[in-house]
């Protein structure tokens, strides 16, 4: 019997276009391999689409707010249909950069030092606040956003300008900038799928570097690490995946500097576009795109 897959994509976040691309790529591969597919927005028609299509599994291809922060997962739980990726609690924790960093620190996982800045509450001179707790340069980013949306590397000369850009966000995370190598690790079924190193031409692996082929970010795989260091970084990624309570596939983002691995964040809904890293890591391991998708579907469940 042909399986019916409803793909959730689009949404209202700043990562809408990436989500649409992920949904399109997954749908194309599933249709090519004989699956019945319906792509749906997470809007007022979702319940009607679920009722009429009667999917066997819901593939969550949403990114960003409402898609990977626990909200849509809570709605999907009420539908009693197996869905992919992490559940309500893990999604909400991973999306909140401050909460996830607190959990990393509690579990002795190295992560850059940080402070939280609230536009309404913090009346102190921000430069003095940073100099007291951190050191320049710093990375400034929204606490609840993905795909490096509105992430800036700042020094004293541009910190105020970039904070002004972020004024629409109540809370901002300001963390020490860690130089060094950018390495990403994919975890699947609580096991390491592999690692990939990025050499962006830009200052760091930002939104443009991730999704614009003209940015010409170099993808290096296999990663040039000693056996011991590779085991170390994949072990940290596995630990973070487990501690947060993630399911399915995740991608952990690291900086490697002075022999230390710094975990920046864990992504519960890694992209599945042509430029996405998890499919590339899987391919290097001999896992085709359709096999990766089918594994994600097979792992789907309720009460995640």
Swiss-Prot record:
Residues where Mg(2+) 2 binds: 265, 267
Catalyzed reactions per annotation: 2 D-alanine + ATP = D-alanyl-D-alanine + ADP + phosphate + H(+)
Binding site for ATP: 131-184
Keywords in alphabetical order: ATP-binding, Cell shape, Cell wall biogenesis/degradation, Cytoplasm, Ligase, Magnesium, Manganese, Metal-binding, Nucleotide-binding, Peptidoglycan synthesis
GO cellular component terms given for this protein: cytoplasm
Primary location group: cytoplasm
Database matches in Pfam families: Dala_Dala_lig_C, Dala_Dala_lig_N
Cell compartments where the protein resides: Cytoplasm
Any GO MF annotation of the entry: D-alanine-D-alanine ligase activity
PROSITE patterns: ATP_GRASP (PS50975), DALA_DALA_LIGASE_1 (PS00843)
Sequence ranges assigned to domain ATP-grasp in this UniProt record: 101-298
Sequence positions that bind Mg(2+) 1: 253, 265
The protein's required cofactors: Mg(2+); Mn(2+)
Pathway assigned to this chain's UniProt record: Cell wall biogenesis; peptidoglycan biosynthesis
UniProt remark on cofactor binding: Binds 2 magnesium or manganese ions per subunit.
Stored InterPro entries: ATP-grasp, ATP_grasp_subdomain_1, D-Ala_lig_Van_CS, D_ala_D_ala, Dala_Dala_lig_C, Dala_Dala_lig_N, PreATP-grasp_dom_sf
EC number: 6.3.2.4
Ribosomal protein recorded as keyword: no
Function, as annotated: Cell wall formation.
Family: Belongs to the D-alanine--D-alanine ligase family.
Alphabetized HAMAP family for the sequence: Dala_Dala_lig
Name under which the protein is recorded: D-alanine--D-alanine ligase
Organism of origin: Pelagibacter ubique (strain HTCC1062)
Lineage: Bacteria, Pseudomonadati, Pseudomonadota, Alphaproteobacteria, Candidatus Pelagibacterales
